[in-house]
Structure formats: structure tokens, C-alpha cells
Amino acid sequence: MTDPFTNPDKTLDAQGLRCPEPVMMVRKTVRQMETGQTLLIIADDPATTRDIPGFCVYMEHELLAQETEQVPYRYLLRKGQ
């Protein structure tokens, strides 16, 4: 089984940051990406388990994978239009 988190186009380490900083950093990073590129987000704020999926829905990005059973949490999103 392949790890979906390998070889993202960009990686964002948001460890040590607390809400709302991780989502603000994700938004800033995604703005600089091209449609279809992937972003690996690494975070340890429990609020990201709600905020990152919600951000993807609201901003119409695709959440390809998430790993939230252990810290640090990992999320992989693909930038939408």
C-alpha cells in the first residue's frame, strides 16, 4: 500500500501553531499554488481536525487524505479552481 502523503508539490509545517493560524497559513500557501497541485499540511492543533476539512469544503479544494489518529496530524489537499 502506498503512502498518499509522499511527494506532495508543497509541504506546510504548522506544528506549534494554534487556531486560527494553521488555516491562515494554509490559505496563504494555497493562493501561491496552481490548480491541481497538492499540499501536505503537518499540524498538532486538535482544531485542525475540524478546520482543515471545513476549509477544503468551503474553498472547494479536495481533501485527498487525512491522518488524525496520532500527532502530528497530516492532511493532503489538492487545490481546486
UniProtKB/Swiss-Prot annotation:
GO terms for molecular function: sulfur carrier activity. It is found in: Cytoplasm. Pathway: tRNA modification. InterPro entries: Sulphur_carrier_TusA (IPR022931), TusA-like (IPR001455), TusA-like_sf (IPR036868). GO terms for biological process: tRNA wobble position uridine thiolation. The keyword tRNA processing applies. The active site is at C19 (cysteine persulfide intermediate). NCBIfam families: PRK00299.1. Interacts with IscS. This is Sulfur carrier protein TusA. It comes from Pectobacterium atrosepticum (strain SCRI 1043 / ATCC BAA-672) (Erwinia carotovora subsp. atroseptica).
